[in-house]
């Protein structure tokens, strides 16, 4: 599973997930992508489950890029523990995802295969997503 090799501090504040994604909104490597429509924490197990669903459906044909990384430690205190006694121990790692963020990218497969693979992967995630295609840059259409 994905997690940082080392961090400066073991615990982090929860923070707020307001606004839209600042970066990672365009497809950078592949031809098709899966875009988040809601804010959420996506933990490393969910990312891995979605990645496996994608790669199993695509088989050997295409290439998959995971565009998010779980770099936020999420702490939990043990069950039935009294309040106080400090912050809990880190239990899992999460990626902070805001609306508009590209989560996965795929290349080297037909559009329908990519769409179905992304649909299967989206069922493993706790947020609503949409299938997006790369928009080609360049002004070919307006040349006279």
Curated annotation (Swiss-Prot):
Protein's UniProt keywords contain Metal-binding: no
GO cellular component labels: cytosolic large ribosomal subunit
Protein name: Large ribosomal subunit protein uL16
Organism: Natranaerobius thermophilus (strain ATCC BAA-1301 / DSM 18059 / JW/NM-WN-LF)
Subunit structure as annotated in this protein's UniProt entry: Part of the 50S ribosomal subunit.
GO MF entry, a single one: structural constituent of ribosome
A biological process from GO: translation
Protein keywords: Ribonucleoprotein, Ribosomal protein, RNA-binding, rRNA-binding, tRNA-binding
SUPFAM superfamilies on file: Ribosomal protein L16p/L10e
Similarity field: Belongs to the universal ribosomal protein uL16 family.
Function per UniProt: Binds 23S rRNA and is also seen to make contacts with the A and possibly P site tRNAs.
């Amino acid at each position: 599973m994905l997690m940082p090799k080392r961090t400066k501090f073991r615990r982090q504040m929860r923070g707020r997930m307001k606004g839209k994604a600042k970066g990672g909104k365009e497809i950078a490597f592949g031809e098709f992508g899966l875009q988040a429509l809601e804010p959420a924490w996506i933990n490393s197990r969910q990312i891995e489950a979605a990645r496996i669903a994608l790669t199993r459906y695509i088989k050997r044909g295409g290439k998959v890029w995971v565009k998010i990384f779980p770099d936020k430690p999420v702490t939990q205190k043990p069950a039935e523990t009294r309040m106080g006694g400090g912050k809990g121990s880190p239990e899992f790692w999460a990626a902070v995802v805001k609306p508009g963020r590209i989560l996965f990218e795929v290349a080297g497969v037909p559009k329908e295969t990519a769409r179905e693979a992304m649909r299967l992967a989206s069922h493993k995630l706790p947020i609503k997503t949409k299938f997006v295609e790369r928009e080609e840059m360049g002004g070919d259409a307006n040349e006279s």
